């Protein structure tokens, strides 16, 4: 019966199995994919802090978040390439100025780079941080995740005010990464 319903609705498309189960649910739009791309790096620090005493869980939060964010960014880029205009409106600041995000072709490329490299860097940083017995690994992962959030927001900012806000956010989020080792050299480098 499931296949009969699907065959009549989809005519043998790859969505046959999912159309039966997803019927009546909200389909994921490009706006929801922007949420899906931005929420993992924003929420991951909370879970990283919660799991700070369990290295495996703490480190897997960053990796899972990077995979979700990359998946959403691929779908956003796909929507843009198919003629869509992915955007996310949050609220008005002034009458003509809003806190919103709009994905442009260059922003989509930058978003793919950020979220794609986040996966590789997350895998590498787990081995590097554990192999060198680095201190404050939880702090590193929290601010690394927030930096990815800031970079995606900069890439998809819809106006100069949003760009400025999240560029400054990115500046403050990367500062603890620069001074992570807390040596005189790293503190001196952070002052530049």
Model-identified regions with their sequence ranges:
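Juxtamembrane transmembrane-helix termini
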Residues: 44-47, 120-123, 172-182
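Alpha-helical transmembrane segments and their immediate interhelical/interface regions
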Residues: 27-46, 158-174
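Transmembrane helix-loop-helix hairpins at membrane boundaries of multipass inner-membrane proteins
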Residues: 17-33, 47-142
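Cysteine-centered motifs
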Residues: 6, 10, 16-19
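Transmembrane alpha-helical core residues of multi-pass small-molecule transporters
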Residues: 40, 65-68, 117, 147, ...
């Amino acid at each position: 019966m499931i296949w009969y319903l699907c065959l009549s609705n989809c005519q043998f498309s790859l969505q046959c199995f999912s159309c039966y189960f997803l019927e009546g649910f909200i389909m994921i739009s490009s706006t929801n994919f922007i949420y899906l791309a931005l929420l993992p790096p924003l929420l991951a620090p909370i879970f990283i802090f919660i799991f700070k005493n369990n290295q495996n869980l703490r480190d897997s939060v960053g990796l899972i978040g990077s995979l979700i964010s990359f998946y959403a960014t691929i779908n956003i880029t796909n929507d843009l390439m198919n003629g869509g205009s992915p955007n996310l409106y949050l609220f008005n600041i002034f009458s003509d100025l809003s806190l919103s995000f709009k994905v442009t072709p260059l922003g989509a490329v930058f978003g793919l780079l950020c979220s794609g490299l986040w996966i590789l860097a997350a895998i590498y940083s787990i081995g590097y941080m554990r192999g060198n017995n680095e201190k404050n690994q939880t702090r590193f992962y929290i601010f690394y995740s927030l930096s990815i959030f800031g970079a995606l927001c900069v890439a998809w900012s819809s106006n100069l005010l949003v760009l400025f806000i999240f560029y400054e956010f990115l500046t403050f989020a990367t500062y603890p990464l620069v001074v992570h080792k807390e040596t005189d050299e790293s503190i001196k480098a952070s002052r530049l």
